Amino acid sequence: MITKKISCTVLGCTLAAALTLTACGGSGSGSSGSMSTGMGGSSSQTTQNAAWRTGLGILTEADGEERAGKINTIAAAVLLDAEGKVADVTLDEMELSLSADSTGKVTMPTDYRTKRQKGDDYPLAAVSSLKKGWTEQADAFGDFLTGKTPDEVKKLATDDDGKPKDADLLSGCTIAVDGYRDAVVRACENAKAVGSARGDRAVLGVSVRNDTKDLTADDDHDVTAQVDITVTALTLDADDRVTGAIADVTEPALTVSADGTVSAPELVKTKLEQGDQYGMRGASALDKEWYEHSEGWCDYLKGRTRAEVASIPDDGSDADLAAVCTISVTELQKAALAAFAEK
């Protein structure tokens, strides 16, 4: 569990967050969305959409010691209303562990599901005083935040173990929430107008790719064990059409030496957080940085249903998509579909 001493921060969605999360709170009707190539709405609707903002927050902690390493990523999708208050929250978390032996051989994890994706396979309910699983408690925390300002969320008190002090919150959530609180705060800080509106709900999707096969370090070469986590925050209207989207990728990597010692980076930035420093523009046919390709992809999703998102070709053959985004969208698409699955 990530505590308030998080050493590596990641904004995130392939943990596309990527790590995808179930919506909490804020339901209703009356939102509107249009396909990226469709007709625009009325001026009053445009004003409403601009007032409601969507945010994605990702925090990652990487840790290495002796012959073991851990990667922990928390993601939050947030919808803020016209007054800047939390209207909906979805949370998720991924915990990954790897090990190495004295010969430098690395053993990677075999299960890349998030806590929300694991469902009953994450056995919290059996040991919970509330007899509630992780998803129930995380959703209860999200519901508790509904109606609060980002500053009020930031000031939410926790004990030394990161667990909430508020009696009302404890009636539905007894897990440590300090990391979730901080991820929600980050999402609020990153929130922007992307087309979301009153009545929408926020969902989160995570997709993980591990291209690491057999890794063994030697005296001449350390090896890098990297996991690519794509996270996508979507807002959906009453018809389950996308009204807004934000997608990000975090790539935490652990280094393993010949004697099996695992070391971790002090800071992990997501691709969105790296901005122009990511360095893609010079190699892009569109002269765009990664975050601009991501924005193009997200705009392209607007107005689409799950089936329509699933039918988007990922081989670059869609001319309209290729005009705004030429990076691989395979993991972005997986994360978006994962978000639909958690609604």
Task: Annotate the PLM regions.
Residues 25-28:
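Bacterial signal peptide processing site
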Residues 30-48:
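Low-complexity, Pro/Thr/Ser/Glu-rich flexible segments characteristic
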Residues 15-17:
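A composition-driven surface/loop motif
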Residues 46-343:
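Active-site- and interface-proximal helix/loop "cap" or "latch" segments in soluble metabolic
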Residues 19-23:
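C-terminal motif of bacterial Sec signal peptides marking the signal peptidase cleavage site
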Residues 1-11:
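Bacterial N-terminal signal peptides that target proteins for export
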